[in-house]
């Protein structure tokens, strides 16, 4: 991540995208953009970042990357059946990642990007922040956390949910997919994304789904403020907590018992809080 920033003078966007941010306007996830910096130059050379992920060679979509897999979770493939709307062949399996990018302490999505400054994390769709934007301090700001998938992590709908959707997939998500589940393209889809937030406690089970509601695309309010969007919670297969990467490159194990105000403060980059990662 920091090697990418050293080259480009910015962090990668959580997902490379352009207005109006429809499904075909999202081209590559932050993970895809950083492949060369993970010593995956050969895989990166086969990925056309000018095209959506579902138009990439099938061999690329199915290629697991060891650095993206937590040893406590193990490789989880991801069925494409819910993506048949974009013409993917039945039976194709996506390789997944156990690590997701911090949206901060908000679960809002909006195309105007007018989020309250105090709740924003260092990654979102279509925005690439500079390190100097992280005024809370790089060592005090979460960049990524664990986003485990597999049968232990079913998904439910809406903040505060606990009952898994019986028809939904588990919380696994493809490493190359920067798209957000939306109610226009995939109206019946209940799943996650490449992003996580601290609106809810880590390791909440069932995992809250990620969803952008097209009719509210200009509403930057979080669910606490009456907004209609969702972002999934962080989760891991480590007992009692999860691993998080801060913006200075340090890794910290946070426990499930962390005080929520402190947890949220660690996830924001310009909230003005005085906190220190344990």
Regions found by a protein language model. Name each.
Residues 1-278:
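Surface-exposed loop/linker segments characteristic of extracytoplasmic
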């Amino acid at each position: 991540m920091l090697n990418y920033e050293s080259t480009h003078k910015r962090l990668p966007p959580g997902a490379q995208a352009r207005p109006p941010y429809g499904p075909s306007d999202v081209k590559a996830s932050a993970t895809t953009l950083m492949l060369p910096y993970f010593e995956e130059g050969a895989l990166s050379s086969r990925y056309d970042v000018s095209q959506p992920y579902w138009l990439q060679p099938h061999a690329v979509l199915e290629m697991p990357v060891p650095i993206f897999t937590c040893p406590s979770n193990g490789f989880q493939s991801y069925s494409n059946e819910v993506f048949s709307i974009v013409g993917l062949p039945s039976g194709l399996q996506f390789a997944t990642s156990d690590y997701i990018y911090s949206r901060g302490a908000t679960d809002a999505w909006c195309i105007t990007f007018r989020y309250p400054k105090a709740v924003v994390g260092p990654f979102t769709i279509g925005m690439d922040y500079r390190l100097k934007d992280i005024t809370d301090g790089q060592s005090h700001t979460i960049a990524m956390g664990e986003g485990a998938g597999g049968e232990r992590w079913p998904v439910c709908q809406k903040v505060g949910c606990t009952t898994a959707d019986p028809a939904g997939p588990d919380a696994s998500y493809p490493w190359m997919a920067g798209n957000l589940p939306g109610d226009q393209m995939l109206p019946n889809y209940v799943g996650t994304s490449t992003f996580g937030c601290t609106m809810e406690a880590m390791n909440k089970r069932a995992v809250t789904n990620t969803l952008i509601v097209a009719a509210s695309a200009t509403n930057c309010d979080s669910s606490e403020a009456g907004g209609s969007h969702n972002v999934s919670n962080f989760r891991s297969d480590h007992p009692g907590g999860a691993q998080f990467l801060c913006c200075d490159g340090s890794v910290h194990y946070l426990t499930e018992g962390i005080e929520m105000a402190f947890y949220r403060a660690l996830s924001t980059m310009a909230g003005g809080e005085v906190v220190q990662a344990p």
